Amino acid sequence: MTVLHSVDFFPSGNASVAIEPRLPQADFPEHHHDFHEIVIVEHGTGIHVFNGQPYTITGGTVCFVRDHDRHLYEHTDNLCLTNVLYRSPDRFQFLAGLNQLLPQEQDGQYPSHWRVNYSVLQQVRQLVAQMEQQEGENDLPSTASREILFMQLLLLLRKSSLQENLENSASRLNLLLAWLEDHFADEVNWDAVADQFSLSLRTLHRQLKQQTGLTPQRYLNRLRLMKARHLLRHSEASVTDIAYRCGFSDSNHFSTLFRREFNWSPRDIRQGRDGFLQ
């Protein structure tokens, strides 16, 4: 597995924060780092396989990656990211106690993926741009300023994350997208889902299309197909069983949609013909 080293990304040995844009982020094999990072998805879509678990990411997704996590990107479509790198929560010169603002593992579950709405994403961009402007400065005031901006970024993300901000339709759409990640195999009635998240059906269609480039049903189908592809690669369940487990009632229809999405049949993926190395 590829290991990314801090010496290749941080501007100096004493820099506590670095900015690494990926505009766009192409498919990238599984790797880990000797540093931590906050991945901010600007726009586009892709699959983020995090510690073996696939997540669909779109504009507004924020992912917190620790130095022992492994992850990869695949099936990217105009996916643009900004990575905010930091050496460790306890490696700041002027900040202490940052762990309290970061996601915490509970009962073996690590809430790595958060979502923020578009207006918050704009504020995030402004903070990141200010950090970028000061990257070449190594004096103490500049270091302190960058670390303060990093603290502001964490506070903004924490206050504005999906769990704490449901005041507008954009935030409710983010909640809906997170719900789909957990209920992709369920039979989805879009009228009922819109009501569940206090959105009109028209608003749901418009905002989901703006955020992902896909209609609601197309997004759900892609999500199901991504989960199915992951199971084909990493489980021994039959193609038919995987189709049913991922929300498809007809395995033939599943195979047709799968080939249309990936240009490979489910059996091709199972046999590794697409060249994916497990």
UniProtKB/Swiss-Prot annotation:
Keywords: Activator, Cytoplasm, DNA-binding, Repeat, Rhamnose metabolism, Transcription, Transcription regulation. One of its GO terms (biological process) is positive regulation of DNA-templated transcription. PROSITE patterns: HTH_ARAC_FAMILY_1 (PS00041), HTH_ARAC_FAMILY_2 (PS01124). The keyword ATP-binding does not apply. It comes from the Bacteria. The keyword Repressor does not apply. Gene3D superfamilies: Homeodomain-like, Jelly Rolls. Residues 191-212, 239-262 bind DNA. The record marks 241, 250 as: Interaction with sigma-70. GO terms for cellular component: cytoplasm. Residues 174-272 form the HTH araC/xylS-type domain. InterPro entries: AraC-bd, AraC_XylS_family_regulators, Homeodomain-like_sf, HTH-like, HTH_AraC, HTH_AraC-typ_CS, RhaR_RhaS-like_N, RmlC-like_jellyroll. It is found in: Cytoplasm. SMART domains: HTH_ARAC. GO terms for molecular function: DNA-binding transcription factor activity; sequence-specific DNA binding. NCBIfam families: PRK13503.1 (NF010028). Activates expression of the rhaBAD and rhaT operons. Binds DNA as a dimer. This is HTH-type transcriptional activator RhaS. It comes from Escherichia coli O6:H1 (strain CFT073 / ATCC 700928 / UPEC). The lineage of its organism: Bacteria, Pseudomonadati, Pseudomonadota, Gammaproteobacteria, Enterobacterales. The gene is rhaS.
